[in-house]
Amino acid sequence: MINYSYPFKNDKEWNKFWACFDDIKETGIIDVKSNALINNKFCKARVYYITAKFTRKWKKIKPDNDTYTFQIGEHDNTNGHFINCDLTEFFAMNNLCPWQHSSYWASSSSVDSERRKEIHYPTVEKSDVDCWSNLWNMVKGLRMYDGKSLESMNMKDHWDVKKMHWVGPFAIGHLKGLKEFEDYHQSKFLDFIPDRDGSTGQNKVIFSDGNYAALMGHPSMTCTHKGEYFGFKPEKKQPRIYVMDFWTCDGDKLIDNWCQIDMIDLFRSINKEYEEFIDDKLHYTG
């Protein structure tokens, strides 16, 4: 059984979604396999894109014959088989979810109001040079956040600050360089959930494969909604945040990071009005 991101409950619903599209093309990006057994299983993961033209009605969404790009992460590990599909370009263009595009968020490479989702290929070739120590040091750095300063995490020690690509959900953007990542995602995310604790996540797995690596958390962390996020005021709720990460590393620096966040379910978990709105549009129950 595959565990899908919102709103797909099973293979049948997943396949019905794609039956509403034509000119479907899958583009593989990276495949990662653990180099050791994890709980008696070799774990594997991949990130890929599907581009397709929306030509038939899906739920209450009418076809527009536009072509959309979906970034998809997949993990098959000791916790099960999981697929996390970013729907936020498709939803944003149909006025179904918030996304960063106002003048306040303006940035030429990530949050341009005219932007569309693009495929990002690895900028680092695969090699056998193990990236585990650098990856794990970066994760430990994230856990050092003091609640005040991004510098407390020392991310500049782990990332190539100029060549870095953080390829997130369309709603957030493709962020280039450490400064853009901090300005347009990390600072906003930590204002949103300053008490986030990744060590308490469930179904967690992280592994490297040479200079490539992958992580999954389902959910990835425990946290409290304490700051405004995408216009949603804090209600002290416990957000559901399902995450997959895929990395490349060049020497001792991380470079590419495809980050899957189930943004629609995250929004649902922090705002009852949005949950009722999107569930109605998608005929979703449960």
How does the language model describe each region?
Residues 1-286:
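C-terminal and inter-domain tail/linker signature
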